[in-house]
Swiss-Prot record:
Active site: C150 (nucleophile)
One example of a Gene Ontology biological process annotation: glycolytic process
Source organism of the structure: Chlamydia trachomatis serovar L2 (strain ATCC VR-902B / DSM 19102 / 434/Bu)
Primary localisation category: cytoplasm
CDD domains for this protein: GAPDH_I_C, GAPDH_I_N
PANTHER family per UniProt: GLYCERALDEHYDE 3-PHOSPHATE DEHYDROGENASE, GLYCERALDEHYDE-3-PHOSPHATE DEHYDROGENASE-RELATED
Protein name: Glyceraldehyde-3-phosphate dehydrogenase
Residues the UniProt record annotates as site (Activates thiol group during catalysis): H177
Length: 334
């Protein structure tokens, strides 16, 4: 599979890192970003959160060079002018955060790409897939797809375990979310969300999120049953989902823990992880699981009403699932 990465920010760089780390058969042929290639090479090599990577990487002749591997840098703002046909691109990893609806993403197809994977919640009628939850519903005819959000990738596996074992009546989710690049280091104007413009490392900032509602896109049985909000907090990486849920059938917190533990070792292996350790957020920097269930952190009010907690590295964990989905698409499009 020949892919290009459109947008070489936090997620774009970590997708490439994970592809190289696992020696994936995926071939990255180009990166399109308006930032200069030598600076992007520097940002790829040195990461303040996840450490340095590919120390041998250099910028030469407009390419990111690592030994025999060369990845071409492009800096084209107009998607319809990109040379995807000439490069024989199978999939565009759309990680700018800008082309999230079908019409905008389809411009990559007009440029010659065969498929687009949006690394964000998509707007409109775009099939959304969460690994371990509904990825097997992928149809090769789906030429524009979404990998949902990092938060949905944490919540949906947990919701599926609850749905399959106990049923879900309704639930509210809060994600206590690490700061992201869209936030300001110090107070500044944010027209759409005034609070979002306040200093990221000085405040706990309430914010909106569609992550809980998006679970209904991959688990239709839960459409209209989940919603939620976010608190942006002053940490660089790792977030946590707090799910308050009313179940359909009576059970115990211990039974929920057993169901999650079983799933983590079977159907959700490599997607979910179960821990009873006294963990904190930094313990999961670099963790590749989508959802780490914290058995010590949850509580029960009665036999149908529970608060459940799951951690996730909102960068590496999510980037890993993007690579998983790319490889699944490759294997199931032949």
């Amino acid at each position: 599979m020949r892919i290009v990465i459109n947008g070489f920010g936090r997620i774009g760089r970590l997708v490439l890192r994970q592809i190289l780390k696992r020696n994936s058969p995926i071939e990255v042929v180009a990166i399109n970003d308006l930032v200069a290639g030598d600076l992007l090479t520097y940002l790829f090599k040195y990461d303040s959160t996840h450490g340095s990577f590919a120390p041998q990487a250099t910028f030469s002749d407009g390419c990111l060079v690592m030994g025999e591997r060369k990845i071409r840098f492009l800096a084209e703002k107009d998607v319809q002018k990109l040379p995807w046909k000439d490069l024989d691109v199978d999939v565009v990893v759309e990680s700018t955060g800008l082309f999230v609806n079908r019409d905008d993403a389809a411009k990559h197809l007009d440029s010659g790409a065969k498929r687009v994977l949006i690394t964000a919640p998509a707007k409109g009628d775009v099939p959304t897939f969460v690994m371990g939850v509904n990825h097997q519903q992928f149809d090769p005819a789906d030429v524009i797809i979404s990998n949902a959000s990092c938060t949905t990738n944490c919540l949906a596996p947990l919701a599926k375990v609850l749905l399959d074992n106990f049923g879900i009546e309704e639930g509210l989710m809060t994600t206590v979310h690490a700061a992201t690049a869209t936030q300001s280091v110090v107070d500044g104007p944010s027209r759409k969300d005034w609070r979002g413009g306040r200093g990221a490392f000085q405040n706990i900032i309430p914010a909106s999120t569609g992550a809980a509602k998006a679970v209904g896109l991959c688990l239709p049985e839960l459409k209209g049953k989940l919603t939620g909000m976010a608190f942006r907090v002053p940490v660089a990486d790792v977030s946590v989902v707090d799910l308050t849920v009313k179940l359909s059938s009576a059970t115990t917190y211990e039974a929920i823990c057993e169901a999650v533990k079983h799933a983590a070792n079977t159907s959700m292996k490599n997607i979910m992880y179960y821990t009873e350790e006294a963990v904190v957020s930094s313990d999961f920097i670099g963790c590749e699981y989508s959802s780490i269930f914290d058995a010590q952190a949850g509580v029960a009010l009665n036999d149908r009403f529970f608060k459940l907690v799951a951690w996730y590295d909102n960068e590496i964990g999510y980037a890993t699932r993007i690579v998983d989905l790319l490889e699944y698409v490759q294997e199931n499009s032949k």
